[in-house]
């Protein structure tokens, strides 16, 4: 994307509309309002807190995890994990508070809607019908309404309505609507709102009422591109019939607000605000890296909605800011170990803009350094990494002179996901350096939306400050790896060991043992929740840990009996009873760290290792280890047009004796090279399938087919796959296929010609074996010749 062109266009647009529109990459923009990729937002205010429920985007196709963002001021948002949904897809969540005092959470999978219930807007949730994935609204529950995107509306009399639908553009189709019974488990009335009333209805219905008018708003077009937009119709009844009124939200002139839609509305006093998603800048392939924005709604005297003026400014704070200190990092001089390109330069980490990102060039250890100009007192640093729903490991150091460095926060063993990551200390320094050292997933690197440095203590984000399991004991310390404060309980006296008891791993403090955790922000007088699980009298039970807390420390002590403990938690906010009860029954999730110990060459096969006419039941892998074994018929080595080659006739299938290296999981960089000749190329022929999984974006499959969409490399992703339109012309000729992926861009070359280049994202899962000659499902037999095959777990650009 040409950013200069976009900035100029933004300025021209501002002049044309009569106000100074900020460029999308200016410092301090209010849109996007959240640092990360999220879509399909529902915004609610419960009490004095704003809640943002949204599809977790940037992870394929809304694969979760479940989360909610909370804010007291509508500017500073904190990501909070939720226990449910736990399904494969978690799309388009909506939450409402019922007159019965409970909160109801609606979400969808294709094509069904589920409903959960909780005593708090944060959960814990459980499916209202019992089983976790029990369905409230099955597909076509209302004839010709494809079930998706459920959204509630509560009328003045307390009646609750649910609206849903997708692909409502077909003749006779539209949006499903129903009035829920008082038990929230059934409907007393349903209706199809046809697309003759809601013109071009595609999906994402949202209903609100103002001055006696019911507004039925919805999204039209494709969520993948610029055609996505919001339109509306009105009625004097919640179920209609409705009258179409027009379009109120669409892509702006310069394309920096691209594909806006799937919205909700927040009413604050007499003001109305529309929260919607738009595509990221620069626009990612497929359109599944969406970001949340908000702009003001205005109404004409007749009640019609004026087309929204979309901005990069947003609306600002709706309450007093919870942050009291100045952000010292804003506009600071900055340098970094690397940056991907001009769209992701280091300055974007210190611009207080949730739509711009510093992305390092590599996926290994990378650093970014800020110069504050003069030495300043620093007590808090917020880091907003690219993906708040996965954990990052990092080190923050400070320096007065840029030469001698001291540790401010050591999170190199962190396993807690969150946004912002909040680190506290007290130091006077001019320079601050963040070093990314690893994390939960391969191939995502240490990209950062914002780094914020504060002179004061900024502890407003509601988070889990301490989280410890038995696995966090290293023989000397009990490390706080699942807690935001980091650090560790130190062994003051006695001894401790890990033991499995009552179905759980526990830390056993022998009699007379004392562990102590110190941090100046710990206090019994401040709002908090502290808890743990202990094993007593033959069962696990809640640990009354309040007595362990004093000003600045927590002390665990076993007197005459061992203390058997795990799941020790401390929150800097007060949990409700239901949340405490859930913690008392639920283990802290301790996810593994991604394997980043690269092997280099993982797979290496060559027909040059054999003699012509050899029959080959086994192929030794000259990469990391192992071999490939024929399932039935073995290959025969032939001489074809100057090269030795393994001859596949559609019946030979080989599987590896080894798993795919863990270094190739998730979105890891890779390079794939092969020499292939195929006399008669079919639509889809699989040369090698490196993965055994078969879900979206989980494939690395080398294909030799004429299918222009996926005839060269297949990832099980409609947008991510790549083919070659002129593949038929290569029949009977040697093809040198070279594919390289750096974690963002994938290039595909055939005989030195670049045939595909695009940004993609992969979600490769653990794979039990590699398959040659067909895919892992046993389909797409290969009928051709393979001279050599190589796979590296690193990015190796093709040399000229």
Predicted regions and their residues:
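Short, aromatic/His-centered strand-loop micro-motif at the edge of beta-sheets
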Residues: 514-520, 711-736
């Amino acid at each position: 994307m040409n950013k200069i062109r976009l900035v100029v266009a933004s300025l021209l647009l501002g002049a044309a509309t009569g106000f100074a529109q900020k460029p999308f990459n200016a410092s301090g923009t209010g849109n996007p309002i959240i640092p990360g990729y999220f879509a399909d937002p529902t915004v609610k205010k419960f009490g004095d807190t704003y809640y943002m429920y949204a599809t977790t985007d940037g992870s394929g196709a809304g694969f979760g995890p479940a989360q909610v963002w909370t804010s007291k001021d509508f500017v500073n948002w904190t990501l909070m994990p939720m226990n449910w949904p736990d399904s494969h897809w978690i799309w388009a969540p909506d939450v409402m508070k019922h007159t019965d005092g409970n909160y109801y959470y609606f979400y969808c999978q294709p094509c069904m809607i589920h409903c959960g219930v909780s005593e708090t807007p944060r959960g814990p949730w459980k499916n209202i019908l019992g089983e976790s994935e029990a369905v409230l609204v099955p597909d076509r529950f209302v004839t010709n309404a494809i079930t998706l995107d459920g959204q509630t509306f509560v009328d003045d009399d307390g009646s609750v309505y649910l609206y849903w639908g997708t692909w409502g553009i077909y003749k006779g189709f539209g949006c499903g609507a129903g009035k829920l019974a008082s038990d929230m488990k059934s409907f007393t009335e349903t209706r199809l709102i046809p697309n003759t009333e809601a013109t071009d209805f595609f999906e994402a219905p949202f209903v609100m009422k103002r001055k006696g008018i019911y507004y039925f708003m919805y999204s039209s077009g494709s969520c993948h591109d610029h055609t996505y937009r919001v339109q509306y119709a009105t009625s004097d009844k919640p179920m209609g019939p409705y009258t179409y009124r027009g379009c109120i939200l669409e892509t702006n002139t310069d394309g920096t607000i691209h594909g806006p839609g799937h919205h909700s509305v927040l009413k604050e006093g007499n003001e109305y605000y529309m929260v919607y998603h738009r595509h990221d800048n620069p626009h990612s392939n497929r359109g599944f890296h969406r970001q949340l924005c908000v702009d003001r709604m205005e109404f004409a005297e007749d009640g019609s909605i004026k087309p929204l003026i979309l901005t990069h400014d947003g609306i600002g704070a709706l309450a007093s800011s919870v942050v009291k200190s100045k952000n010292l990092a804003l506009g600071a001089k900055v340098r970094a170990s690397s940056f991907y390109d001009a769209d992701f330069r280091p300055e974007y980490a210190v611009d207080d803009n949730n739509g711009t990102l510093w992305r390092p060039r590599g996926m290994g250890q990378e650093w970014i350094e800020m110069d504050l100009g003069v030495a300043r007192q620093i007590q808090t640093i917020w880091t907003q990494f690219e993906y708040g729903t996965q954990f990052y490991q990092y080190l923050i150091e400070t320096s007065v002179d840029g030469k001698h460095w001291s540790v401010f926060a050591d999170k190199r063993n962190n396993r807690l996901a969150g946004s912002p990551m909040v680190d506290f200390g007290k130091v006077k320094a001019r320079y601050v350096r963040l070093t990314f050292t690893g994390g939960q997933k391969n191939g995502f690197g240490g990209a950062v939306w914002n780094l914020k440095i504060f002179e004061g203590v900024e502890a407003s984000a509601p988070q889990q400050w301490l989280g410890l399991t038995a696995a966090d004991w290293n023989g000397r310390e009990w490390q706080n790896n699942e807690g935001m404060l980091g650090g560790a309980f130190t062994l003051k006296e006695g001894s401790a060991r890990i033991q499995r008891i009552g179905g759980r791993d526990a830390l056993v403090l022998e009699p007379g043992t004392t562990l102590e955790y110190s941090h100046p922000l710990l206090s019994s007088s401040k709002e908090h929740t502290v808890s743990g699980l202990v094993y007593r009298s033959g069962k696990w039970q809640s640990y009354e840990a309040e007595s362990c807390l004093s000003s600045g420390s927590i002390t665990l002590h076993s007197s005459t009996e061992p203390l058997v403990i795990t799941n020790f938690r401390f929150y800097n906010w007060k949990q409700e009873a239901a949340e405490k009860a859930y913690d008392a029954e639920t283990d802290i999730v301790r996810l593994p760290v991604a394997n980043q110990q690269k092997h280099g060459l993982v797979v290496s096969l060559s027909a040059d290792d054999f003699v012509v006419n050899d029959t080959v039941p086994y192929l030794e892998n000259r990469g990391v280890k192992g071999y490939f074994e024929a399932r039935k018929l073995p290959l025969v080595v032939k001489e074809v047009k100057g090269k030795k080659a393994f001859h596949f006739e559609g019946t030979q299938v080989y599987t590896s004796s080894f798993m795919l290296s863990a270094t190739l999981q998730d979105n890891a960089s890779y390079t794939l090279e092969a020499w292939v000749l195929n006399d008669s190329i079919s639509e889809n022929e699989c040369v090698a399938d490196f993965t055994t999984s078969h879900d979206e974006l989980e494939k690395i499959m080398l294909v030799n087919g004429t299918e222009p969409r996926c005839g060269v490399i297949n990832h099980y992703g409609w947008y991510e796959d790549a083919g070659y339109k002129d593949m038929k012309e290569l029949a009977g000729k040697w093809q040198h296929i070279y594919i390289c992926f750096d974690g963002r861009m994938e290039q595909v070359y055939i005989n030195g010609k670049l045939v595909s280049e695009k940004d993609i994202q992969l979600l490769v899962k653990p794979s039990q074996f590699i398959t040659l000659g067909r895919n892992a499902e046993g389909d797409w037999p290969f009928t051709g010749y393979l001279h050599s095959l190589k796979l590296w777990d690193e990015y190796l650009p093709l040399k000229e």
